[in-house]
Amino acid sequence: MNAKTLPFDDSIEAETWHVPLFIRGRLTLQRVLSGMGGWKLDPKDVPLIIRLVENPKYDIGLFAGNVSLFSHDCIHVLLGRGLLTKDEAFVIGFTMGSTKKMFRWRKNLFMFCAKYLYPECYRFGEEERLVFNIALEAGKRCSADLSKFDFKKYKNYSLDGLRSKLKIDKNFLRHCYEFEKKCFPKSVESQRLI
């Protein structure tokens, strides 16, 4: 990555793609999403077990916070997260927490699925489980249920404007990310957060 390349430009590989939470400038949601290059996941490429757990088309009432892949990508951007496993754990946890419907039995069932049923590269280990739990609590502070929000109507909003509309508190997220960074000093995704 050269000095002029942003960490979310389309020349960046998926493993290093992320949107810093405190990036300067007036970036729109659409601008950042367009930086997800040719590696962007197609909905049909998502493993079936993940679709059953996380996709609203397969909602069987077991889990809260099911969102489309587009909405999921938007939430990655708004939370300043990349695409690695701890990033996924935070985005999923925050989304589920925002519903205010993630009761203990749902959380435990999701954790079982994420630890034992997800394909290996998507599985949550103990570190990801902690990140998920932090995010679940952080998501409860969000005034909007992100699983019900129509992100397509807000593609041209600035990131800060959309965070403000959804009452996503960047300073609270900073505290969550500082804690995560201290907990996982060898984790690439945790170290690049702040």
Feature annotation, model-predicted:
Residues T5-D160:
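Core of folded catalytic or high-affinity ligand/protein-binding domains
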Residues A138-I194:
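Long, solvent-exposed, polar/charged low-complexity segments
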